[in-house]
């Protein structure tokens, strides 16, 4: 079964919720703008904040570390990251958090590697981003490999407290 979602983290959590509710094994999870119709069965998943919160609470209850890993893993440039993260959650709920100590686990390793790459890029950009002033507003443009802006926001908000600064990703 292929699930199609809106591309948000809550939408991804709703995919996990629906796969458990419908007892379906997923072969792919695609953002709606990336989906190409195929002969395989597919279903569009609606984002429901209550369902997403239930899934996140369950993950946090099992392993707060995995919840953090999921949130950061979702920001990575890992191909098919949704499927890797889905399998990570399935394994967590099935086996418990014990497998998280085995860093060479085939479910865990690709996610850990991608998150390590994300964190390295965030660290690099904290020292690399330069702002230019234009009309009283500080602005910067970056071209990251991962979706780093949510992780950079708190650093630069604390550093530039003038309130009028902008950083955007080049498309």
Where are these regions (language model features)?
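N-terminal ordered "arm"
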Residues: 1-50
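Generic beta-sheet signal
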Residues: 1-3, 138, 165
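Short His-Asn-centered micro-motif
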Residues: 5-7, 140-145, 168
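Short, hydrophobic/amphipathic alpha-helical patches that form generic packing surfaces
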Residues: 11-22, 87-94, 154-158
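Charged, alpha-helical interface segments at or near domain boundaries
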Residues: 30-124
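Hydrophobic, aromatic-enriched interface-forming segments
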Residues: 106-161
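Residue-level detector of conserved catalytic or cofactor/ligand-binding positions
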Residues: 162-171
């Amino acid at each position: 079964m292929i699930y199609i979602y809106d591309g948000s983290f809550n939408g991804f959590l709703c995919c996990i919720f629906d796969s458990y509710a419908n007892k379906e094994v997923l072969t792919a999870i695609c953002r709606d703008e990336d989906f190409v119709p195929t002969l395989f069965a597919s279903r569009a998943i609606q984002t429901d904040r209550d369902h997403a919160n239930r899934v996140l609470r369950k993950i946090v209850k099992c392993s707060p570390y995995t919840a953090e890993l999921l949130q950061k893993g979702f920001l990575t440039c890992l191909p098919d990251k949704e499927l890797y993260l889905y399998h990570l959650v399935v394994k967590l709920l099935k086996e418990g958090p014990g497998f998280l100590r085995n860093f060479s686990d085939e479910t865990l390793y690709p996610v850990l590697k991608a998150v390590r790459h994300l964190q390295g890029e965030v660290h690099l950009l904290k020292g690399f981003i330069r702002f230019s002033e234009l009309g009283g507003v500080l602005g910067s443009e970056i071209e990251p490999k991962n979706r780093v802006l949510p992780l950079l926001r708190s650093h630069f908000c604390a550093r530039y407290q003038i309130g009028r600064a902008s950083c955007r990703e080049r498309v």
